[in-house]
Amino acid sequence: MQSRLLLLGAPGGLGDVASRRVRLLLRQVLRGRPGGDQQRLEVRLLHSGATDSGETVSIGDVSYKLKTPKNPELVPQNYISDSPAQSIVQHLRWLMQKDLLGQDVFLIGPPGPLRRSVAMQYLELTKREVEYIALSRDTTETDLKQRREIRAGTAFYIDQCAVRAATEGRTLVLEGLEKAERNVLPVLNNLLENREMQLEDGRFLMSAERYDKLLQDHTKEELDAWKIVRVSENFRVIALGLPVPRYSGNPLDPPLRSRFQARDIYFLPFQDQLKLLYSVGANVSAEKISQLLSFATTLCSQESSTLGLPDFPLDSLPEAVQILDSFPMMSIEHALQWVYPYTLLLGHEGKMAVEGVLKRFELQGSGHSLLPKEIVRVERMTDSHGSYAHVTIRVAGKEVTIKVPAGTRAVNQPCAPDHFIQTVSHKQLLAEMVQSHMVKDICLIGGKGCGKTVIAKNFAALLGYSIEPIMLYQDMTARDLLQQRYTLPNGDTAWRSSPLVSAAREGKLVLLDGIHRVNAGTLAVLQRLIHDRELSLYDGSRLLREDRYLSLKEKLQLTDEQLQNRSIFPIHPSFRIIALAEPPIVGSTTQQWLGPEFLTMFFFHHMKPLVKSEEIQVIKETVPNVPQEALEKLLSVTHKLRETQDPTAQSLAASLSTRQLLRISRRLSKYPSENLHDAITKACLSRFLPSLAQSALEKNLADAAIETNTEDSLEPELENYKCEVVAGSLKIGAVSVPVHNAHEKMKVPDVLFYDNVQHMVVMEDMLKDFVLGEHLLLVGNQGVGKNKIVDRFLHLLNRPREYIQLHRDTTVQSLTLQPTVKGGLIVYEDSPLVKAVKLGHILVVDEADKAPTNVTCILKTLVENGEMILADGRRIVADAANVDGRENLVAIHPDFRMLALANRPGFPFLGNDFFGTLGDIFSCHAIDNPKPHSELSMLKQYGPDVPEPVLQKLVAAFGELRNLADQGIINYPYSTREVVNIVKHLQKFPTEGLSSVVRNVFDFDSYNNDMREILMNTLHKYGIPIGAKPTNVQLAKEFPLPEKTFMGYWIVGQTGNGMQKVLCPAETNHVDIKGPVLVNMEKYPIEKHEARFLSFTEECTSWKFPLDEVNLICDIAVSHENGEQTLYVAACNPVSLYFMNMTGKNGFFVDFFDIFPRMASGSWRPFVTVAPLGSPLRGQVVLHEEQSNAVLLLDTTGSAIRRLVLPTEEFTSKKSSWWSKEEGETYRMCKEFSHKNWVVFYKQTGNSLTVLDVLEGLAHTISLPINLRTVFLVAEDKWLLVENETNQKYLLTKPAHIGSEDTGACQLYMLKEELPSTGFGVTQETEFCIPDKVSSDQLSSENLTSAVGQKIASPNRILSDENSHATIVVGFPDLMSPSEVYSWKRSSSLRQPSVTSMTMYTGKRTNATPRHNNCVTLTHTNQVVRILPPGEVPLKDLYPKDVTPPQTAGYIEVTDLQAKKLRYIPVPSAESLSPYTAWISAISDTDALLAEWDKSSVVTVDMGGRVRLWETGLERLQQSLMEWRNMIGQDSDKHVQITIERDSNEDVSDPKHGKEDPDNMPHVGGNTWAGGTGGRDTAGLGGKGGPYRLDAGHPVYQVSEVEKDAVPEDVKRAAREMAQKAFQQRLKEIQMSEYDAATYERFSSAVQRQVHALRIILDNLQAKGKERQWLRHQATGELDDAKIIDGLAGEKSIYKRRGDLEPQLGSPQQKPKRLRLVVDVSGSMYRFNGVDRRLERSMEAVCMVMEAFENYEEKFKYDIAGHSGDGYNIKLVPVNQIPKNNKQRLEILKTMHEHSQFCMSGDHTLEGTEHAIKDITTEEADEYFVIILSDANLSRYGINPARFAQILTSDPQVNAFAIFIGSLGDQAARLQRTLPAGRSFIAMDTKKIPQILQQIFTSTMLSSI
């Protein structure tokens, strides 16, 4: 008997400290040679001669007799080391005891290969055969018991591992019990307990004892007939599992747990481990090794797990030491990073903790000099065992050569591969990867698009590996990873190895791309492959590590073939795995894929993003001719975004990955004119970013001096953007490309498409990318024409397309192949995707965002590397060179492209974030609704017959709605599709009104009141009368005009009255021009509101311009030029001018403050009149200040102002300054002919006229013999003058050109007003009255005829004065004969000085008459229009007795001489009035001024700055009313009848009237009575063949629309009472008074809309979180494609169904988000509340937060604090006392109010912010938000904004935002520039505060759910 001593272990000796020290010293000397220690366990193997089973193994005192295995190839090989550690021997001894007892064991312990290795060592020691199964979440009962396979058309049951082990007496090793889904493992319960099991095929497994008992009574044949099978007495189960709950997984089922005996297999004890490491790392100093181990052990301790640090993978330490052994000079800290990448794994605290431990064990700070620099060279060497390479690496100045596995192809030298640019960091990374490659598989971690795949490929090329890329996706099953079933041509089922398995056998390098996506339970099946290089497959074959395979081969003396027949294969020694992953999201609960189990499998290398210099190098070498300047700017922005901590910036940086930058550079180099701003915003898809991110991006771009293209704002003409196909090449815009010659014509789309500029621009952009070979992604709202654009694009390119539409249930299989069963065989049909790849078609992926992102991920490898594995084993590869001669390969056709279409990310679209996951592999294009111009031209083509104004209204209204949607005020983004549908309807049914047709779109919103209100307002603003009834016509009441009176004659220049004509001399001077001075013209947007939205009135449009509260309007004028009207409004306090073109969207404002300073004393009141000039001086205006006689010429196009000095000024008295002349001297300007570019000035009471000819620059002064009162220019050459004091009228005729030699001087005639003879009834003593207005042109002869009532054609003028409504002078001024005067007298004269007005005005007479008499003559419509104050209007007749007349700014009196009617139209009163009431009354006696607008309408401007247009002409009104009624639709109230036309078989006899029924009863049908409905031959309605229709007047029993809509009054009342009662009841419950309720309602209602919007979004989030998932392996549901074959074979659980996925057990609880609102309740809030309501707005904001988050406490926990002079943390709402009802909420608002009223002054904004940010993180939460409201005037309190910015960003975990209230001038804007982008808001208008809050919530909180 020979006995062999197998192993010696070191004890875990417990000697005293001293002896331990001595022992350690000795060990240092002897270096791991075990010294004289105490006794230890030995394993003895005793041979007892030749008998087979006589061998015994004893461990210590336990011994076990070996049996010869039946299948020796199933016994584990080479697991036992020569000297196992003592602790392992202890484990083995325990296992042997349990084995002898016949008990099943459970080895429990931390993740890692140790437990498996202990089990395998024991089985190898006892020569037991093993059945191994790695459980995963995909394991089902069939994997354990029996599986069906089809052989020759029959289904057989094949025993699986558990059954095989039981019958053959093997040991079943179950690994990963915590991975199996609940209730799968109980299948084994009975087998474990009683060794019994019922099988599917009818057999029954019975325990050995019972079977043997039965054998005593029955024969074996009988038992076989009963299908009873004996379970071997040697059958044992060893289960391996992790302790749950410490690790994630399903906890053990109690009945299952009770059937196992457990043993904790913890990491090796310190000493054993140390010894192991010493033996591995002989070159590394012992001290370093023990420090390394101490560090690792510390991180595995119980304390560190409470910190939330994942366990350190101790099992990887030997490999790390092995590397250090080859590179003793390398930094240990760095090697630790590979084993335990704590910088990626842990948050800030975790990192600090780990670094603390590193310091403690002196492992830190070994510097960068000790890192590997680069690979110097690679040499190939092949020996019998496979291929290796010698790689030389330079580390710390030395070169070290190591031997690493290599692939089968030729190796590359480090600098050889083309198109791989080596940067310093990449060289270093490659060197490090080779070091890891020496000992273990690698996992590369890096953000998307940073070049992981490129590095991995380069690494493979370096070592001569073939690559096997495997794209992983989320719902991948274990079968997809290892083996899949398929059918053989004869119908048998078989297993096909996955690429991973074949790669393992062939020694390839496997790229597991996207390992972070796969479920950890699925990856578990790879653990054994990675740790031990062993694998058991579903079909029973096993893969062994090569050395084990060889030793087995040697022992059994078998050939490779024989072993393969026994299904045993070697794994190639060169086989390696590189996993590619994105970094785990620190602190997130869901995406923490890098767990303790995963850490044991790989060495981790972090691929950091490129630094700027390297990125520039990469881009420059890849795209050599990229413009330098653009590149610099691009990278500076990108790196600035990457470096910030701000999550918003981070998400933007993610869209600017290296891959995107390369794409942008490629475009820039090909199209150098490309605008960088566009390129970046396109890459980030900024059009659809939340508003915060958008502003952050804009700010960063502005900082980097990247500007938008200024021309972009203007729309290019369609001429420049034509698409045309010329000579076989397509040209869109500036880009051209040859047209494709398609074979499959029918697949080329052809679509109705109307060209418009914007879509052309988009298509040009797409073409640019298409030419560069990019795949495109079009993102946009619904209905903006994404599909149309793509189809049109492909049509132009003549490319065939394949179309695939994704949806919720799209799976990876359905994207690639569709399996179907035909005749018992599985046949795969190519999906459009595969067809497109093969044939080179264009694949259009529609609704790309609807499929789960884990599915669409597989498109990534296809687009990026052109590789993809199909379900039937074929694979798609990029270059055809690899295809030749290898079957199952499909080469990508060079023409293949993918065009993906997706909706914009984010609410309200419910899609998944396709752009976020895959955006950077496509070139993205944001598709927007067409701009108004493009949209209009497109709609014209859809509705050629729809009137253009209607289309314009639609375009404008929808444009505004889209803006609202972009601002987040409404959720639904209205698109072109909706407008097109409306237009199509109007085109087909022109009589239907617009307002009823738009309801086709807007009825969706009719139940949402907020939304409805916004819609109504917008549509009404653009004059779409939705909700109006055609009967709502509210025109002014008409009164009869008094009869006309003949007033006598005006006689001019007749001799004999002693007054001969007088010649008036004129002198001509040049005008002195001073200037020009540039003036600042401010532009402001104008919102026009159509006035006729609910009822039809004379008013048609109104808008407001931004008038100061104290400013007054003193004159208005309108210029008409080529059909365009421009309105000029002059204001006088301060002097300023507003003007706007009526078709435009913008107004302009010019301030003349520096020319006319406002006087401190206020005694001087400037008064400015304005006269617009005509062409060629169009756009120029003369302004005249009446008291200083200053004449200014403003050029509005060149924004310059000149002063014109008139000659008269020279002899005016030179006073101290020209604006302080004595009172009462006023100069006037006559501007009737200013459009001819001349105006006349005169001084009241003066005796000269000055004619200013602006075009010539001349001034003609005419001296007169009389003192003037007023002047009317009744014609260009005839002027009516009125003398001062006497009011005598004169007519001045002037030659055409003053100053030319040949003409005479001006002539002055006296004008005599002669009364008719007294018989006419006109009294003699008529005082001369001064006309208010004399028209400067005449009535047409038709108008004159109808006015005077006799046919007459003659020159005439119409005038108006205070005594008459209108007066016509026939024959004046051209005929020298006496002119007849006809007048329509007023019942009482206007402006009778009443008592009140006398007291009101004091001072001189000039003040008593207002400056403007507001009278306009519309000669075209025969009307005189003026505005009267309410006192001059017959209000009693206008309004019924009991109605109080409304407040008005005055009434427009329309005297219509055509219809002989008077109408009074009320002008609504001004929204705000200047406090200078006396000044207003000096300007006008009404609060509005009037001017002629065009031939039949007038414009009024009130003192509050609101402009209104009024149509007064009857014809125009008639026409507008028609249009308005058409908009509403005439037939909405008509009685509609349904008629079905069918031929009745009865013939038609002669038509007749039929009998009249004496009783006139209603009749239907028949052939007898007249007046029936639906009969034949007789007259009636809807009949057949009758002579005519006859309605006998029967009532049609139909409630009219109006009545239908009206609910009876009593019902309404009951409803009201009920609501009131409920309200009272509710108040009583919460003890709130009605007064309080009203107060609260005031705050609540102000923010109702925001609350509503937020709650909708929060609801959606709740819903999104609860989306159901596919549950697989169900017994009912839909057939799962992946299990079709199992279905053929007759299995049951082959279905899948949607269900709520239970969270994985052990996965962390979802924590709520924390929000803290810190509001300002300082004294200044109370003090300035009166100015801008800031305190109230803050209270509204608080109210909004409280209301919006009510009932979402489990998702959002909020609290509200205040800061003021009293302190920085005033608790308003503590986190656990959320107010429940309105009363409690009101209490909080009251507290805020009172606090700010009574607190100390001072400011604690900074302290409040700092405290909130520090304090909020004390409690665990998913995300933290702090929002500060402050009105801090930072500079006043001496706070440095930079310090504030620093506090805001002090904790990267906390998203802090600041909202500043207040009007700090430009300080606010300066502040915003210093604060971080997107983090600070300035609320100049306090109304915005709730909106800003809503923005913050929607764009940040919601992004991450």
From Swiss-Prot:
Residues 1-45 form a transit peptide. This is von Willebrand factor A domain-containing protein 8. Exhibits ATPase activity in vitro. Isoform 1 is predominantly expressed in liver, kidney, pancreas, heart, and skeletal muscle (at protein level). The keyword Transit peptide applies. Residues 1-260 are annotated as: Interaction with PEX7. InterPro entries: AAA+_ATPase, ATPase_dyneun-rel_AAA, P-loop_NTPase, VWA8, VWF_A, vWFA_dom_sf. Residues 1541-1560 have a biased composition (Basic and acidic residues). GO terms for molecular function: ATP binding; ATP hydrolysis activity. It comes from Mus musculus.
